[in-house]
């Protein structure tokens, strides 16, 4: 059944969230609809934009209400994978020996009738055998899968069709650049060291063997800020080092962000494809002192009386994610000589990186 009567819409999708989510405000009835409020919690739903699915899942809540001047009916829900966030991880004995991340994921999500898709950049890691993996008591399915993804250095998200995706961001480019003074309605930047550390030290314990240990350095963090992480598995040297690199990489990517608002859910005005997570997009913003290719991490489609039809794009330095996938990007450039953009070109002598290694944003 198709539903109409939409008044306000917010749909969010992202590479760093296992489930998309939506919030809608609708009228009690609309043309051709005789029943009042036919949408109910627990119903299956597919949200499409011009027949293109952007979310496939379930209605979580309905919130009817009224006051002296108006009535309203709010509906919210998530992708099918939202159940993986809420529900406990259960599978036979709760232990796997020599299973791949894909096998573990399939075993955990099969009761929810969710398909597991492995992208091309994660093929090797998603199919590599994990010596031993256990469900921890009280752990949700998402927590269990996210722990496995950290161990293998990959990411998990959903694709708008209700499937669980194991992959890394690719290199597909957006058809439209983001240019200050042209199509950028608003831009909010965030450059933070709060969750970044100078060194990440991962420790593991293999039975009958000494502690496995690995480390990774964030060359931009110039003061002493160490972080010790206990490995999720019985880590040995190489896996502990990979886990440390994963932690550093993800924290760098999350520490440097900007949210760009554009007019329309589609690129090139209303004529191009939908804005989508995972696209590479050129950003030219003298105000932020950036002229570079960025990665769209999440997309929020909005429609309301105040803002009209707009799209919020959360973007990040793609090199942080490239370290995970093995892809190399060009360095970010400051749009003004002598100014400090995302990549200032300045390196602390104390943490000078070796030739061939990347430096990251500094503000």
Can you say where each PLM-predicted feature lies in the sequence?
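Acidic, small/polar-enriched beta strand-loop surface segments
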Residues: 146, 150, 155-306, 319-363
């Amino acid at each position: 059944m198709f539903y109409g009567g939409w008044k306000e819409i917010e749909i969010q999708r992202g590479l760093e969230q296992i489930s998309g989510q939506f919030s809608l405000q609708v009228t009690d009835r609309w043309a051709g609809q005789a029943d009042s409020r036919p949408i109910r919690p627990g119903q299956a739903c597919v949200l499409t934009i011009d027949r293109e699915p952007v979310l496939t899942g379930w209605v979580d809540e309905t919130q009817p209400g009224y006051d002296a001047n108006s009535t309203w009916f709010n509906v919210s829900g998530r992708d099918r994978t939202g159940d993986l966030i809420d529900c406990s991880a259960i599978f036979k004995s709760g232990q796997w020996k020599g299973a791949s991340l894909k096998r573990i994921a399939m075993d955990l999500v099969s009761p929810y009738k969710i398909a597991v898709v492995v992208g091309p950049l994660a093929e090797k890691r998603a199919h590599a055998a994990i010596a031993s993996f256990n469900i921890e008591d009280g752990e949700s399915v998402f927590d269990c899968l996210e722990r496995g993804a950290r161990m293998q250095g990959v990411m998990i998200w959903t694709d708008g069709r209700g499937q669980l995706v194991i992959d890394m961001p690719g290199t597909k480019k957006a058809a439209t650049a983001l240019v200050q003074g042209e199509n950028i309605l608003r831009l909010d930047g965030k450059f933070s060291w709060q969750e970044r550390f100078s060194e990440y030290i991962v420790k593991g314990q293999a039975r009958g063997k000494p502690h496995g240990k690995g480390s990774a350095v964030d060359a931009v963090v110039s003061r002493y800020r160490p972080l010790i992480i206990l490995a999720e598995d019985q880590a040995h040297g190489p896996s502990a080092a990979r886990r440390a690199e994963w932690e550093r990489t993800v924290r760098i990517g999350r520490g440097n962000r900007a949210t760009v608002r554009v007019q329309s859910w589609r690129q090139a005005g209303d004529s191009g494809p939908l804005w989508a997570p995972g696209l590479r997009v050129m950003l030219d913003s003298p105000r932020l002192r950036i002229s570079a290719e960025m990665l769209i991490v999440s997309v929020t489609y909005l429609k309301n009386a105040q803002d009209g039809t707009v799209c919020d794009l959360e973007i990040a330095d793609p090199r942080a994610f490239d370290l995970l996938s093995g892809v190399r990007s060009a360095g970010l450039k400051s749009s003004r000589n002598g100014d400090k953009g995302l990549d200032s070109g300045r390196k602390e002598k104390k943490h000078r990186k070796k030739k061939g290694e990347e430096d990251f944003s500094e503000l």
